[in-house]
Amino acid sequence: MKEKLIYSRTCVYNINYHVVWSVKYRRKILSAEIEIYLKELVQKIASDKGFTVHLFEVGEGDHIHCFVSAPPKLSVTDIVKYLKGITGRKLFEKYPAIRQKLWKGQLWNHSYYVETIGSVSEENIRRYIEHQSKSY
């Protein structure tokens, strides 16, 4: 686990998320060409905003899976806002034809799924915390 730790000036952390979001109306518009562009764009966004995208894949042409690590100063809602907002705007600029397959000028569904990814199980954390008071 120590090799996964990230050291900053004020803290040590290992914060990882699995984020999933979909195209509005689940339209299958994410072609192989768009996927290549998206992967490059997402890496640039992550670099500019201060987080890391370890893995990014398009599923079935209509949704995204993303494995992200971030410092504690970045909330997952901010990360999703950056990823969905910037990619949506840039995709419409580069591929204006996809706008015709969607209504109201929105590429992504409003909602998203997120879960934390850790190297220690919930059970181990509970056991560790419960045993803290017993060590005195």
Segments predicted by a language model, with ranges:
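Basic nucleic-acid-binding interfaces
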Residues: 1-136
